[in-house]
A protein has these predicted regions:
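Short phosphate-binding loop-to-helix
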Residues: 70-91
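A glycine-rich helix N-cap at a beta->alpha junction
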Residues: 66-75, 124-128
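N-terminal beta-strand-loop-alpha-helix module at the start
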Residues: 1-64
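Short glycine/serine/threonine-rich phosphate/pyrophosphate-binding segments
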Residues: 17-19, 79-83, 106-111
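Non-catalytic positions within long, well-ordered alpha-helices that form the structural scaffold/packing
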Residues: 41, 90-93
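Generic beta-sheet signal
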Residues: 33, 53, 73, 99, ...
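Anionic-ligand-binding alpha/beta catalytic cores of soluble enzymes and soluble regulatory domains
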Residues: 96-141
């Protein structure tokens, strides 16, 4: 669809690669948030941008994806690496955001990702979260058909 720009943000949570997930991100532009880069290989993707403080990416990922442009941020920041990735996607014209690897794993991270999806939906941004075998769609009162 003309004018649509779907971005998939690779987050560091759990991921199960499924045919449905592959269809959902087909043709999407990809941004990795810190250790979310670990999912790039399993998905057969090379992100156009890698953001974060790189406190959890690990030296092997840093070497394997050395050619991917990076935006390094201080660990002492007021946003999560996922939020920074979403901000970049919006800056680059995202009309839809898929948060990949945003469920499962550490409960505080999953909760933060759910809150981020709600924030995006409240601002009119189309988004959802998937880890391949679980999905979450923010529903805002008065906006669901």
């Amino acid at each position: 669809m003309a004018g649509m720009s779907r971005f998939a943000i690779l987050l560091g949570g759990d991921l199960v690669v499924t045919p449905r997930l592959r269809r959902q991100i087909a043709g999407a532009r990809i941004i990795a948030a810190d250790s979310g880069m670990k999912h790039a290989s399993a998905l057969g993707l090379v992100p156009e941008l890698w953001v974060g403080d790189f406190d959890s990416a690990g030296s092997e990922l840093l070497l394997d994806y050395a050619l991917v442009p990076r935006q390094t941020h201080s660990a002492d920041k007021d946003a999560t690496d996922g939020e920074i990735a979403v901000t970049e996607a919006l800056r680059l014209g995202a009309t839809e955001i898929v948060l990949i690897g945003g469920l499962g794993g550490e409960s505080d991270h999953a909760t933060a990702h759910l809150g981020l999806a709600l924030h995006l939906a409240r601002s009119g941004q189309k988004c959802f979260i998937s880890n391949g075998d679980e999905e979450a769609y923010p529903l805002i009162a008065g906006t669901y058909e």
